[in-house]
Amino acid sequence: MKIAYVFLASGAVASIAATSEHRSSPFTAVSSPPPSCSSHPAPTENIAAQLAKFRPVRMPFSTAGLSAKEVSMVRKLVEAGQDLESIFWRQSDPEGLALYKALANCPRPAEQQIRHYLLINGSRYDLLEGNKPFLAGAVYEPGHALYPAGITRKEIEDYVAAHPAKKAEIYNPWTVVKRSGKDLVGVPYHVEYKAFLVPAAKALRDAAALSDDKAFANFLRLRADALLTDDYYKSDLAWVDLDNPKFDVIFAPYETYLDDLLGVKTSYGVAVMIRNPSESAKLATYKKYVSDIQDALPLAAADKPSNAGHPTPMEVMDAPYRSGDLRHGYQAVADNLPNDPRIHAEKGTKKLFFKNFMDARVNYVVLPIGKLLMRQDQANLASMAGYLSVVVMHEISHGLGPAYARVAGKQADIRESIGPIYSGLEEAKADIVGLYGLDWLMNKGVLPKTRARDYYASHVAGIFRTVRFGVAEAHARAEMMEFNYFVEQSAITRDADGRYAIDFAKFPGAVASLAHQLLDIEATGSRTRAEAWFQKYGTMPAELQAALAKTGSVPVDVDPITSFGENVR
């Protein structure tokens, strides 16, 4: 869930200075002793080559313009974030964490390369290549360490059908599912991860005591309470209500990217952010028309939620520290949170744009790959400004569309109804509804129609970046489907020389028809239809795979280097 030249100065990047088969509790030993420097598992792929796909980029913490008290507050927020990083590893791959720690003082470069690739992925599984194990002996299971080893979705569904009173416990986004004899139980996160949540909550309260912003301090105290109860509702309301804060944090288990078993379990993520006020102010144009775009969506009126919460906060921030699911694998350049549909109905959502991460991605990845794969005149249309606009509307669009599904005449949670494919469906909906919203803004004269080619070219260049190393990750699955649909509609064609071109006359119609399909799938909560749609459109075409094979000189993503270190325990 995820901006630039309109907001960013030229050359901004320079200023950036740059589950295994055995799933243990985080508080019990793994099945075998931690490996030593001489006995670690052998790589199953060329780790040096994998690391070379990432561009290291420094994301420093600049204290310029901050008081000593503010610097201390930021450091307390980071301290709390490091506790949540320790939890994330235990959700993702406890045995991978044991190996990461065991290799800390190993002297050989090969061992440090393994350790660094473990850090990039937060596990022994390549998050950008379909969770493919990259070390011998690692066996991936859906749902990582959030479920018992060997369990299947069918087993869970059959158990819940036989024990309906257990459904809320098993499907709760904030429980770890475990076996208890022949039964399944859901252990609350605040119980399972208490050893890390208690110090994290204390650090948040310490940060609150250092804040001169009373509303932000109040939010931090509420969020500290939420960590110890798994009830984030009150603190989420306070978070969305923050008015142009100088500092902000993402600090919760929000996203379900680790859970490809049921698609409901959340993992912890953290971003410590410092606001860029001048860039944030430029988002006003988009904020003004959010409810109008919602009204204009190709969706039945009954499926459109109340607009009472719109428009909602949008902020451009630098993020000098991230951890958990915001640190590993796909490096988000923006976010749209919280995910609670109750908050959507009452307040909407907060859209956050990570300026330093956006700069790095566009300069180092998106524009270079577009120049290799797109027809040259169209590749030159892709820009920081275009990509920014596409990402802004993507994040706005996560909060648009149905808030609930209609299932058997009743309201149902969309995420639960759709199942594991939900993450990909929702990312695609945000992409396509975002483009639909840009078309609406241009048709209403809010944005100049001359920008259309810029927007479309920037989005297509972004598709190539997202899918080039596989289509298992949610964003890649979404954009692979979009690409194939656009090709089917002749909105994207392939020239005789193998370069791709956009048919600018057909593209808006293809966007509108795809928006209708995706919104309707969410509104009806049809898992069968969602899975069939991605089955039809989700495969990488051979000719695109061959074209992407020529992009080896372009990084797959950035590898952020912060001023704070990892400090995982």
Where are the model-predicted features located?
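Sec-dependent N-terminal signal peptides
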Residues: 1-21
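N-terminal mature-domain "stem" immediately C-terminal to a signal peptide or N-terminal signal-anchor/transmembrane
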Residues: 27, 32-125, 130
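Fold-level signature of zinc-dependent metallopeptidase catalytic domains
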Residues: 47-59, 64-74, 83, 163, ...
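Short, hydrophobic/amphipathic alpha-helical patches that form generic packing surfaces
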Residues: 79-90, 115-123, 176-179, 202-206, ...
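Secondary-structure edge/capping motif, primarily at the C-terminal ends of alpha-helices
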Residues: 91, 207-211, 525
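Amphipathic heptad-repeat coiled-coil/leucine-zipper-like oligomerization helices
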Residues: 100-189, 503
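Long, well-structured alpha-helical subdomains associated
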Residues: 435-531, 536
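Extended, compositionally biased alpha-helical segments that mediate assembly or anchoring
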Residues: 515, 519-569
